[in-house]
Structures are given as C-alpha cells and as structure tokens.
C-alpha cells in the first residue's frame, strides 16, 4: 500500500469531464492505497468519496480557487510542505491547470488534451501565452506524463516537443456498472420518453463541442425521421452556449430540440438507455468518455472522425466529418433506418466498452511508480 498525494484543486464542482476523472481515479486508487486529497472547502460536498477510511481530506480556503493564487501555491507552498511529509508520489490529475516545480518526490501528471491548438479562439491571448509558453516548461520537469489517448500524446510531442519516452498512453476508464442498471431516477426526463430521441451529452460550448453542425444536420433529416425523433442535449451552458440556444430559438425545429441542462449521475443512465442514437460531433476530444457510456447502455454511436474519437470508438462506431452537416446527417439517417446495422453496432459497442476501466487506468499509474 502506497501513500499518494492528489491535488483536486482543478475540480469543477463535479460538472465536467475533468471532475469525473479526478474523483474516479481518487476513489479507485483509494481501494488499495492511502490518499491525501487536497481540495477546496466549497468542493467537498460535490466530491463523491467512496472509501473514506483510505482518503484523508486536506481542506483549503476557497481563496485558492483564484487561478493565479492557486498556481503560486502549487509552485512555492506545496514543495515546501512536501519536505515534511512522507509520500510515495504526487499525482496531479489536471496537469494543464496547475503549475508545479520539481517536487522532492516522484511526480506524475495526467494531460487530457490540447484542444486550444485545434479550436481557434477558445482562449484569449493571455491564456494562450500561458498554454504555449508556460505549461510545457513545467511539464518537462515531471517524472512521467500520462496522456489519455494516442491523440493527446501526439499533440504533446508535436506542440510541446516533449520527450516521447516520458509520455505514457493511459486510456481513461468509466463507471460501467452505473450504465448497466436499467433503473434510474427520472429527474424530469420522462417527458422525452414519449418520443424517440438522438442524444448528445456535453457542455453547451461553442464552437468546440459543435452543437450547431449537429443541429443543422438534424434540420436536413427526412421529415419522417424528424417527426419520430427529437434532438436532446444534456450539459451545462459554458462559453458560447448562448450562440447555440439563440440559433435553436430561430430554428423551424425549435420544438424538437431539447436542452436538459446538467443531468446528475442518478438520471444519466436512464437518459442514455432510452436514446435511439448517440451523436458526438465535437471538433476535438482528448478521450470521449460518453462514447463508452453510450455503448455500455446499448446505444449505437456516430461520432467525429477527428482527434481521439475514432481511437476510442474503434470498429463499433460510424464516423463523420464534423465540419460537414450533410455528412453528419447521412450517418445519422443510415443508422436510424437500418435495424440490422444498429443491432450490430450495439453488440460491437458492448464488447468495445469492456476494454476500458478505471481499475486498468490506475494500475498503470502504480506500475509506472514501481518501475
């Protein structure tokens, strides 16, 4: 059993993919190891702790939520603190958000993506300077960097010119058991069961998540499909979300397009399981856990042919050009019109999803330490 220090300072209130990663890895590692968890006071109620006997929470003032203050703390205070604490290694699960210097013990970092290099205008000039000039300098000081896909690993080498030998591809897992359950709380979803629906689970962020091209694809579908299927979005509104919602308000099909907002874990499995198709049109993803969640829920998946999505989906998905609404429309229509294709995709998806787990992910982290 090892003693591991994990910084959860980059936790987003439990409402993002990074949040899910942090609490999933923390809980999995705590099954067999002792964890000291650094976390802001305001985040404690949002953090689902499953093995409390092995997790020691170290609370910090919410004042540290300010990005600059938080970075300075990781740079100067944490290294000093580590001189008086005995840990086997430090794990930073959101490496692009928290700077660090060379700590006096082994330090492992997970990098999720470099989406800012692929999505023009995602960040302002100040933040892009931080991303391009500051982050790579500190990543070079890590003992090992875990990239959650080959796509992310390739970006780290291409844009940051990091040594390939210190970057380990370590695929994300997901909570498979949660999505195998046929029962889940309704949480306002029941009204959509009266009509079939195409589902997209992602924060409403423009342009990165590419909701507009999916909406345009839906508008191009045959009338029969539009009459039979709604388009349902589940996710909190983020940067540019108002652009997506304004477009829908002016669409002829605004009554067919539903925004559920953030859907909590108790209702998410039912939302997936009752979908007829999962569409993932994002321009760029470091991994794409929703693909696995949909597959485990026995829902066929169509997704972008970019970044990590084809890598994660494998032969179980149909891909499209996310820049081409016509191509998105064609793939959606093809799957919805062909029952044999749908059933084949569902079977392939169930087997594909079984290849990914948090247990496997965390084992690789520990294995790297033991090397």
Where in this protein do the model-derived segments appear?
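Carbohydrate transferase catalytic cores enriched for Leloir-type hexosyltransferases
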Residues: 1-371
